[in-house]
């Protein structure tokens, strides 16, 4: 069996970042933006060995002359040609491996359309000729990475936020909830807040600047109203940020008004529940006998949960909704930005997992639909 000889490749396809590496490592070797850029004016970049498309960091560096596209929206691949370019870049440029020689584990958001998995499977076997393949649900991997098999994962990345109760290693599908509000919406909202104070950022290139401001300066207020009041009374919490052109801007109460959107989606006119209500509703859909465990093991995962103060605030909000006798514990592992990848690395290097792979022979016999039988 080929699997045992070479280590597996683990790729966590996020809407914003693609994380990739070798199973058994404790962190991904590559993490690059899931972006494909094509020249706005083909043929104008003379003498630069112009390519028809750029991927990841390179696309970001040349963003001024490119049109940028994210092939994954809300956790679902919307453009398979671009996605193929990202995977190709991943194997050959970032990891420098030949996919024909390694089993490959990919991740996906829960409640993804069946067709999405089938297309992933088809691409991996037919375009990249991998010897064996598996698709795992992101939230389950995050829980493994935190050393638990039971709990509820609040996973918020760039494109989608979901709450996934997991019991003894299995996601409870009837209790999974998801909202299409995550990092990308926060970036857009931050853009809107800065526009209110006269700063206009609108192009795809400038959006990356906003994303950086959001990641470096924003935080979640424990008490939103009190924080607003404090900012009105003094300006000592203002932070300055230097733009790429050398100008400096001052970011004020936008610092906490931006991530507040996670708790109050109504700010942008969405009728979604906030992440605290989502967590509570998800737990309430579980069987009454198993609710104690998820309340006590709320595990945060994904880049959008990296805001300072988010764990304390979520704990406070869920406590207000839950029965008063219930013990609430929010776990925020420091490596949660990569916890999905880490879980994938752990899972695919277990000896007990080696029989779970979909092999090329099984694929040839059953076609892409084999993925629904072997990966759940």
UniProtKB/Swiss-Prot annotation:
<dbReference type="GO" id="GO:0016787">
    <property type="term" value="F:hydrolase activity"/>
</dbReference>
<dbReference type="GO" id="GO:0005737">
    <property type="term" value="C:cytoplasm"/>
</dbReference>
<dbReference type="Pfam" id="PF00022">
    <property type="entry name" value="Actin"/>
</dbReference>
<keyword id="KW-0547">Nucleotide-binding</keyword>
<protein>
    <recommendedName>
        <fullName>Actin, macronuclear</fullName>
        <ecNumber>3.6.4.-</ecNumber>
    </recommendedName>
</protein>
<keyword id="KW-0963">Cytoplasm</keyword>
<dbReference type="InterPro" id="IPR004001">
    <property type="entry name" value="Actin_CS"/>
</dbReference>
<dbReference type="GO" id="GO:0005856">
    <property type="term" value="C:cytoskeleton"/>
</dbReference>
<comment type="function">
    <text>Actins are highly conserved proteins that are involved in various types of cell motility and are ubiquitously expressed in all eukaryotic cells.</text>
</comment>
<keyword id="KW-0067">ATP-binding</keyword>
<dbReference type="InterPro" id="IPR020902">
    <property type="entry name" value="Actin/actin-like_CS"/>
</dbReference>
<keyword id="KW-0206">Cytoskeleton</keyword>
<dbReference type="InterPro" id="IPR043129">
    <property type="entry name" value="ATPase_NBD"/>
</dbReference>
<dbReference type="GO" id="GO:0005524">
    <property type="term" value="F:ATP binding"/>
</dbReference>
<comment type="similarity">
    <text>Belongs to the actin family.</text>
</comment>
<dbReference type="InterPro" id="IPR004000">
    <property type="entry name" value="Actin"/>
</dbReference>
<keyword id="KW-0378">Hydrolase</keyword>
